[in-house]
C-alpha cells in the first residue's frame, strides 16, 4: 500500500481533525447543518489530494468524539458520501475513499489540462517553458539529454549500497565535508584520470548537484572576482545560458562552426571567460579542432578563463576520445562533469574542479548553498567506480545507444533525405538542419501535435542560424525512434508550401 495512504489510515484510527484541521465551530456560522459541513470538508480533502483513493476515514464513533458532535452527524455525512460514490464501506476496512467528487459537486481547483503545442513552442522560451516541455507527456520522446534510464544498474546499485551501509559508521550520518565525501572525491579523480586524462588531487574536487549547480557556484565565485561577462557558444545550451543569466551574468554569443568555437570571435566579445563543450559540442556535436584548441589555450594564457562542460564525453562510437582541456591547462580551466549522462540525472551528482585561486571561494559557495551533497549516494557511486561496475555499465549502454543512434540515422536518411545530419559520432543526440527556411519551432510544434517531442535548434541560438532540430535517441527504443522519425517527416511535409 502507498505509504501516504498508510499514514492517513493510521491517523484515521485516532480521528483526523488534526490532519484536516476540522473545526465544527465554523459550520455553525454557515448555512446548512453539521453534516453538510462535514461532507464538504471531506470532498475538499479528496479533491486536493489530502485524502487519496484507498485511504480510510475514521470510524464514525471516533470522529464524532474527536469533533465533539453527535455520532448521527458523522453517520449521515458518510451515508451521503457513499450515495454519491466518493466513499465505499467495507466490513473490515471501514469507510474507504473510492473516487474524487464528480464535476459540479465540489468547488475545487480545476485540473490542469495537458499543455498545448502553442503554449510550449515559443520562438524564444525561458527556463519555465523549457522545463514544462521537458515534463510534457508524448507518445514518442526524442527530447535530448537523457541516457537509457531503463538500463540503470539497479542490482549493482543495491549491492553497492548494502556494502556501504555495512561499513557505515554512526559518525558518517553527521554533517560531512561540503566539498564531498573523501572516498568519492578519490574515486572521481581516478575515474577522470582513467577516462579523461585529468590528473588531480582529491582535495581539488568539489562534489556538486550536477553541472547546473557547478555553473551556479562558478557564477557566484567569478562574480566576486569581477567576472560578470561569460561568453557562450552559439548555438549553445539554452539551459546553461539561462543558469548563468539567473545569476546576473552577461552571456555574449560566440559562433560555432564545423571546427568548433571560433576563437577570433571570442576575442572580439571582450569576455574574460567562456563556457564551452569542446569534446562534443551541444547541440551541433562538433569536436573542437586541434588548431582551435591551440588558439583557445593561447587566449587563456593571455588571461582568459575556460569553463569546460564535459557533459557526455564518455559516450563515443565512431571516433577516438578527445583530451580534456583541463588535462592540459588546469590553472586556466574550470572543469564540470556529472553522472547525469552516465547513469541518470535524478541522482543530481557531479563534480567541479577549479584553478587553485578560486578553490576556497568555490567550497564556501557550495557550503553556503546546501552544506554539501547527500553522503550515501556519493559512497555508493564511489563503490561503483572503484569496483568496475560503472565501467561495465558504460560499456553496456554504449552498445545500446549506438544501436539506437544507427536506427535514427537510417530512419532520417530514409524519411527525411532533405535534412543535413551532424554530430552523430558521439553523445546521446544528433542535430539536423534544413535549408528551405522552414520554422523549426513550427515543425517541433507540428510534431508534438502528432505525439513526437523534439527540440527546435533555434532555442539554443542567440543569433540567426539555419533552422534545425535536436533529436535525442539514447532513451528511446529502436521501433519508437523509427515511428517518431516517420511522424516527424509527415509533419515536415505538411508544412511545405502547396505545390512543392
What are these regions (language model features)?
Residues 87, 250, 305, 453:
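Residue-level detector of anion-binding/catalytic polar loops
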Residues 157, 334-398:
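Conserved core segment of the aminotransferase class I/II
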Amino acid at each position: 500500500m502507498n505509504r501516504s495512504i498508510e499514514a492517513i489510515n493510521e491517523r484515521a484510527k485516532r480521528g483526523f481533525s488534526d490532519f484536516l484541521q476540522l473545526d465544527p465551530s465554523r459550520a455553525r456560522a454557515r448555512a446548512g447543518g453539521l453534516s453538510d459541513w462535514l461532507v464538504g470538508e471531506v470532498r475538499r480533502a479528496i479533491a486536493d489530494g489530502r485524502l487519496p483513493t484507498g485511504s480510510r476515514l475514521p470510524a464514525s464513533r471516533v470522529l464524532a468524539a474527536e469533533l465533539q458532535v453527535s455520532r448521527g452527524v458523522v453517520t449521515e455525512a458518510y451515508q451521503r458520501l457513499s450515495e454519491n460514490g466518493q466513499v465505499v464501506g467495507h466490513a473490515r476496512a471501514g469507510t474507504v475513499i473510492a473516487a474524487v467528487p464528480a464535476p459540479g459537486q465540489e468547488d475545487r481547483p480545476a485540473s490542469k489540462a495537458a499543455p498545448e503545442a502553442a503554449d510550449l513552442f515559443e520562438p524564444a522560451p525561458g527556463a519555465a517553458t523549457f522545463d514544462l516541455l521537458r515534463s510534457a507527456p508524448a507518445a514518442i520522446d526524442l527530447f535530448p539529454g537523457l541516457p537509457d534510464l531503463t538500463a540503470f544498474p539497479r542490482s549493482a546499485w543495491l549491492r553497492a549500497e548494502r556494502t556501504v551501509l555495512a561499513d557505515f559508521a554512526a559518525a558518517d550520518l553527521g554533517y560531512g565535508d561540503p566539498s564531498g565525501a573523501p572516498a568519492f572525491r578519490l574515486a572521481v579523480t581516478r575515474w577522470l584520470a582513467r577516462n579523461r586524462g585529468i590528473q588531480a588531487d582529491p582535495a581539488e574536487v568539489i562534489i556538486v548537484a550536477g553541472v547546473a549547480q557547478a555553473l551556479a557556484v562558478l557564477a557566484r565565485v567569478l562574480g566576486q572576482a569581477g567576472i560578470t561577462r561569460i561568453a557562450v557558444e552559439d548555438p549553445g545550451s539554452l539551459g546553461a545560458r539561462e543558469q548563468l543569466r539567473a545569476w546576473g551574468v552577461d552571456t555574449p554569443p560566440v559562433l560555432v562552426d564545423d571546427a568548433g568555437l571560433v576563437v577570433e570571435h571570442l576575442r572580439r566579445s571582450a569576455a574574460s571567460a567562456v563556457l564551452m563543450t569542446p569534446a562534443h559540442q551541444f547541440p551541433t556535436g562538433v569536436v573542437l579542432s586541434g588548431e582551435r584548441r591551440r588558439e583557445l589555450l593561447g587566449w587563456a594564457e593571455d588571461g582568459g578563463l575556460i569553463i569546460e562542460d564535459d557533459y557526455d564525453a564518455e559516450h563515443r562510437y565512431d571516433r577516438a576520445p578527445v583530451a580534456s582541456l583541463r588535462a592540459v591547462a588546469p590553472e586556466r580551466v574550470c572543469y564540470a562533469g556529472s553522472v547525469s549522462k552516465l547513469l541518470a540525472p535524478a541522482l543530481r551528482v557531479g563534480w567541479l574542479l577549479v584553478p587553485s585561486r578560486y578553490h576556497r571561494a568555490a567550497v564556501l559557495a557550495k557550503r553556503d548553498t546546501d552544506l554539501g551533497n547527500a553522503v550515501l549516494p556519493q559512497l555508493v557511486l564511489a563503490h561503483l567506480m572503484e569496483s568496475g561496475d560503472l565501467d561495465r555499465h558504460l560499456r553496456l549502454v554504449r552498445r545500446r545507444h549506438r544501436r539506437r543512434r544507427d536506427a535514427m540515422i537510417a530512419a532520417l536518411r530514409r524519411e527525411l533525405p532533405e535534412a543535413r545530419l551532424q554530430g552523430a559520432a558521439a553523445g546521446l543526440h544528433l542535430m539536423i538542419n534544413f535549408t528551405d527556411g522552414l520554422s523549426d519551432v513550427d515543425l517541433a510544434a507540428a510534431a508534438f501535435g502528432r505525439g513526437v517531442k523534439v527540440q527546435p535548434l533555434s532555442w539554443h541560438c542567440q543569433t540567426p542560424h539555419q533552422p534545425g532540430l535536436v533529436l535525442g535517441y539514447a532513451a528511446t527504443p529502436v521501433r519508437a525512434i523509427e515511428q517518431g522519425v516517420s511522424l516527424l517527416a509527415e509533419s515536415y511535409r505538411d508544412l511545405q508550401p502547396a505545390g512543392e
